[in-house]
């Protein structure tokens, strides 16, 4: 099989019995657009107003090649204004949204990198364990990650592999010129839910939405996942 987007070679990856056909070309155009749209998504860097279609246009005209190029778009006003659907106001809104994204929480930043199997809740567990120290996370080995409750060998290997790949190291060095992590307040809340895993479902009476309940659980030390598994304590 070859990749329908770039014609590159593909391979089958087997993770927990789920077989997935994956393109092996790291410069694949389809993978590139997915990595950009993941990077700007709400739970990642949260750059408002950048649809996949807009990102594709910017990639096609050479404005975006690596994810850190987002932070240099302000230097390309004329080219952006030439893109279909962009005027002075939408350009300014975009630049404002990019500027607003420059102080993410560390967990959202790690999630934004698209490290395989590292969802936002796992990123939060990792950041909490390493006391929000990004350098400690970058330098950690697999044993350090496996020592974290609910982080298994697959995630540990993915983290170590990501931070030891020269191409990714270059991306991080560039990103860190623009990004400053939000200072996390030390949680004063008693960690009564530490080590417990929750899945939030159904309708809520005492909370405005699921996100609010999720944050409350995490503040008390619990972990919220998207789906029920044998590790789930409460539904």
Where are these regions (language model features)?
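DNA strand-break repair and replication-stress modules
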Residues: 32, 39, 84-235
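Short, well-ordered alpha-helical packing segments
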Residues: 56-59, 95
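Membrane-interacting alpha-helical segments
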Residues: 12-25, 79-94
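Cys/His-rich short segments
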Residues: 1-48
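A generic structural signal for well-ordered coil/turn residues at beta-strand boundaries
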Residues: 6, 17-19, 54, 194, ...
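Compact, charge-rich alpha-helical regulatory domains located at protein termini
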Residues: 48-56, 64-82, 147
């Amino acid at each position: 099989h070859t990749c329908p987007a770039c014609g590159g070679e593909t391979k089958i990856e087997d993770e927990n019995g789920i077989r997935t056909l994956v393109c092996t070309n790291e410069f694949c155009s389809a993978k590139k657009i997915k990595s950009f749209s993941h990077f700007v998504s709400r739970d990642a860097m949260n750059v408002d107003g950048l649809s996949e279609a807009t990102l594709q246009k910017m990639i096609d005209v050479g404005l975006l090649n690596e994810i850190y190029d987002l932070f240099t778009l302000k230097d390309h006003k004329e080219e952006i204004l030439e893109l279909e659907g962009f005027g002075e106001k939408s350009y300014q809104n975009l630049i404002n949204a990019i500027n607003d994204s420059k102080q993410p929480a560390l967990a959202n930043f790690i999630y934004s990198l698209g490290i395989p199997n590292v969802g936002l809740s796992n990123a939060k567990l990792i950041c909490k364990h390493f006391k929000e120290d990004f350098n400690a996370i970058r330098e950690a080995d697999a044993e350090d990650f496996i020592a974290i409750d609910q982080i298994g060998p697959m995630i540990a290997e993915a983290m170590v592999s990501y931070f030891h790949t020269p191409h990714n190291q270059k991306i991080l060095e560039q990103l860190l010129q623009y990004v400053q992590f939000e200072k996390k307040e030390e949680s004063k809340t008693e960690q009564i839910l530490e080590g417990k895993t929750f899945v939030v479902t159904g309708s809520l009476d005492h909370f405005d939405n699921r996100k609010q309940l999720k944050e409350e659980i995490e503040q008390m030390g619990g972990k919220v996942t998207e789906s029920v598994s044998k590790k789930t304590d409460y539904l």
